[in-house]
């Protein structure tokens, strides 16, 4: 396991143990709904299903096609806020 992987695992473990991971997920859900991201993704999914046809569109097709677009559509302000919260948590709980 690389040094980066170990650090990520340690950070993830600390976030999970302290309950911060769930709080961050809830914040992310709320922010993405608030900015219309979820509605944009629903519309993209509907477009893919129309294009492929209901009988031929699979969940895997949707995941493959929508995931990269979904990541790009996350507003920078949401990414910054989440990163800021993670950094603040880590600074507060540094060992």
UniProtKB/Swiss-Prot annotation:
Subcellular location: Nucleus, Nucleoplasm
UniProt record, GO biological process: chromatin organization; mRNA export from nucleus; positive regulation of DNA-templated transcription; protein transport; transcription elongation by RNA polymerase II
Principal location class: nucleus
Chain coiled-coil ranges: none
GO CC terms, sorted: DUBm complex; nuclear pore; nucleoplasm; SAGA complex; transcription export complex 2
Keyword Transcription regulation carried by entry: yes
Keywords: Activator, Chromatin regulator, mRNA transport, Nucleus, Protein transport, Transcription, Transcription regulation, Translocation, Transport
GO molecular function, one term: transcription coactivator activity
Family affiliation: Belongs to the ENY2 family.
Quaternary state and interactors: Component of the nuclear pore complex (NPC)-associated TREX-2 complex (transcription and export complex 2). Component of the SAGA transcription coactivator-HAT complex. Within the SAGA complex, participates in a subcomplex of SAGA called the DUB module (deubiquitination module).
Protein purpose: Involved in mRNA export coupled transcription activation by association with both the TREX-2 and the SAGA complexes. The transcription regulatory histone acetylation (HAT) complex SAGA is a multiprotein complex that activates transcription by remodeling chromatin and mediating histone acetylation and deubiquitination. Within the SAGA complex, participates in a subcomplex that specifically deubiquitinates histones. The SAGA complex is recruited to specific gene promoters by activators, where it is required for transcription.
Entry protein name: Transcription and mRNA export factor ENY2-1
Organism: Salmo salar
Source species taxonomy: Eukaryota, Metazoa, Chordata, Craniata, Vertebrata
Gene encoding the protein: eny2-1
């Amino acid at each position: 396991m690389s040094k980066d992987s170990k650090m990520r695992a340690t950070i993830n473990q600390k976030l999970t143990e302290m309950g911060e991971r769930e709080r961050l997920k809830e914040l992310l859900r709320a922010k993405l709904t608030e900015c219309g991201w979820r509605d944009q993704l629903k519309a993209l999914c509907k477009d893919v299903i129309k294009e492929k046809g209901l009988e031929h569109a699979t969940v895997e097709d949707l995941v493959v096609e929508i995931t990269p677009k979904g990541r790009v559509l996350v507003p920078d302000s949401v990414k910054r806020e989440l990163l800021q919260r993670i950094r603040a948590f880590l600074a507060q709980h540094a060992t």
